[in-house]
Amino acid sequence: HLMQFETLIKKIAGRSGVWFYGFYGCYCGSGGRGKPKDATDRCCFVHDCCYGKVTGCDPKMDFYTYSEENGVVVCGGDDPCKKQICECDRVAATCFRDNKTYDNNKYWFYPAKNCQEESEPC
């Protein structure tokens, strides 16, 4: 669920997902096309691809189960589809933490007209 994704971003990356990643580059936020502009935008591209591979549940609307063990987020639950959503979100939040290029604010509120290149395959 997108609200859980926001929570994981805060837990793992230590930042608000909506504020820092909701309107960034060509892939962070709604939609996505063109080539990722930097490492942070690539995190969003990979997350979009991950959601695109989920079948049998809705990555944006379905809630999943996770826990924290020694400060590490662990995806759980019996539903493999929902666990896959959790893994997509966990990996993206970790990617945001490890690639803090969002400080390059030339990509904040980046115009979609600058994202016209052919998209890379997932």
UniProtKB/Swiss-Prot annotation:
GO terms for cellular component: extracellular region. Contains 7 disulfide bonds. Its cofactor is Ca(2+). InterPro entries: PLipase_A2, PLipase_A2_Asp_AS, PLipase_A2_dom, PLipase_A2_dom_sf, PLipase_A2_His_AS. One of its GO terms (molecular function) is calcium ion binding. Expressed by the venom gland. It comes from the Eukaryota. It is found in: Secreted. Binds 1 Ca(2+) ion per subunit. Coiled coil: none annotated. Pfam families: Phospholip_A2_1. The active site is at H47, D89. It catalyses: a 1,2-diacyl-sn-glycero-3-phosphocholine + H2O = a 1-acyl-sn-glycero-3-phosphocholine + a fatty acid + H(+). Snake venom phospholipase A2 (PLA2) that displays low systemic toxicity and causes severe symptoms only at very high concentrations (15 mg/kg). Has neither coagulant nor anticoagulant activity. PLA2 catalyzes the calcium-dependent hydrolysis of the 2-acyl groups in 3-sn-phosphoglycerides. This is Acidic phospholipase A2.
